[in-house]
Structures are given as C-alpha cells and as structure tokens.
Regions:
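Membrane-embedded alpha-helical bundles of multi-pass transporters/translocases
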Residues: 1-248
Length: 248
C-alpha cells in the first residue's frame, strides 16, 4: 500500500494539495526547530558561528539546488520523444552537474578559511572564526547532495510522482531537530550536532527521491557527454531560474 502511494501519479490539483500540505508541515516543524535551537544555543558565539558558517554554502545551494535544475529540466524531459531519450538526458545532466558541483564544493571547502577570516568575520575572535570555518566545511557536503535531489525530483515531477518529493521536503526540519536534541544530551558536540543534522537532512532527501527513481525503473548511470545541446539548454535555463530565485 505504501509503495502504491509512493509511486502514484497525480494531476496538477492533487499535486498542489500534496505539496501545500508538505510546506505546511515543514513550516510547523521549522517553528519547533527554531524554538529548540534558541533555547539550546541562545545568541552566543556557537549560534553566531552556525549562522555565519551556513551563509556561503546556502548561497551556493541557492544556485545549484534551489529548484533551478528542477524547473529547467522538467520541460526538456517532457519534450523528449520517448523514455529512452528522457533517461539519456537525465543521466547526462546528473553526471555533468554532479561533477561540477563536487568540484565547486571542494573549492569552497579549501577557500572557506580565507573567506571567513578576510570577508565574513574579519574582526571576530580566533576561536569563533575557527568554529565557523569547521562548520562551514561540514556544510559544504550539502550542495552536491541537494543538487542531485533537484535533478532526481525533476524526473519524478515529469512523471507526476510527487509523494516522495513531499516526504523529502518534510524530513528537512526533523533531522535538524534531532541534531539540536543530540547537542542537548551531549553538550560537547555543541553546534556541530545541528550542522550534522543539516547534512543528514540532505542525505535523507536524496534517499527518498532515489526510491522514487527506482520506482520508475531508472538507474543512475555515468554518461559524460558535455557537448549535448539539451544539456546546454538545461544549464542555461537553470542559471536563469537560479538568478530569479536568488533575487527573490
């Protein structure tokens, strides 16, 4: 029964209801998350380091996984002549974007010390700077996971499978809540626990949408074809969409 629900196809109106419910549940859990976070860390150095550390990875995520690739890829998947061509485009985009985001994330990990010390927190004490750098490096695992989630979600959207996309959206806050709870139980973990919760949230999202992809009988494959014209269309549309999302 759960499998049937997870793989069911929905029309536009039903999909809108499902996603609206997911947004509502996530918003309520977000209130719980913020309340617990504030009660645990207040406005001290750990909280300041957490929010500062998230700034650079979140800016990157806005470009690579803020819905831009989903919005760009769905119409091009639907425009393909058959499912074989859909899968080919899907694999090319997955491979190319995965490699590009992995490389950029690695650069972010290497450069974040310079960014924090020189631009983000130049006048803050060394301990807070170091905590911010360490947490930022941990959070740079997110962009690759969320970029893959965005691409897999596009394939599910093109096939009108919204259930697992909604579940993936909901799991974001519970994992962070779990991280805050862990920090309460083991204070030595401090702000690293909710930061790990953020990474766990991205991993959980990837697990759920991957289940949906398996339900389509699609399998992730390495297909390196950077000169494919449809790939260039996806990347251009994604850049335009990301620019719009970031400006909002």
């Amino acid at each position: 029964m759960l499998r049937r629900w997870a793989l069911r196809q929905y029309g536009v109106s039903d999909a809108a209801v499902i996603m609206a419910v997911a947004f509502g549940v996530s918003a309520l859990l977000g209130i719980v998350r913020q309340t617990m976070f504030g009660a645990t860390f207040g406005d001290g150095a750990a909280a300041a380091a957490y929010y500062a550390a998230a700034r650079l990875p979140e800016t990157f995520i806005s470009f690579v996984a803020g819905g831009a690739f989903t919005a760009a890829l769905v119409p091009l998947l639907l425009a393909q002549a058959d499912e074989a061509q859909q899968q080919h485009l899907f694999h090319v985009v997955l491979t190319t974007v995965g490699v590009a985001v992995a490389v950029l994330s690695l650069i972010g990990i290497i450069m974040c010390e310079w960014f924090v010390v020189t631009i983000l927190l130049p006048g803050i004490d060394a301990n807070t700077q170091q905590l911010t750098i360490s947490v930022s490096r941990l959070l740079f695992v997110q962009p690759l996971l969320l970029a893959l989630v965005s691409i897999l979600s596009a394939a599910l959207t093109a096939h009108k499978r919204f259930s697992l996309i909604a579940v993936a959206y909901i799991v974001h806050n519970p994992t962070i809540i779990l991280g805050v709870w862990v920090a309460q139980q083991w204070p030595v973990l401090s702000i690293y626990a909710p930061a790990a919760g953020l990474v766990l949230a991205a991993a959980a999202k990837l697990v759920f949408v991957s289940m949906g992809i398996r339900g389509l009988n699609w399998r992730a494959r390495w297909v390196w074809q950077p000169h494919l014209p449809q790939l260039h269309q996806v990347l251009w549309l994604a850049i335009m969409s990301a620019h719009h999302f970031v400006l909002q």
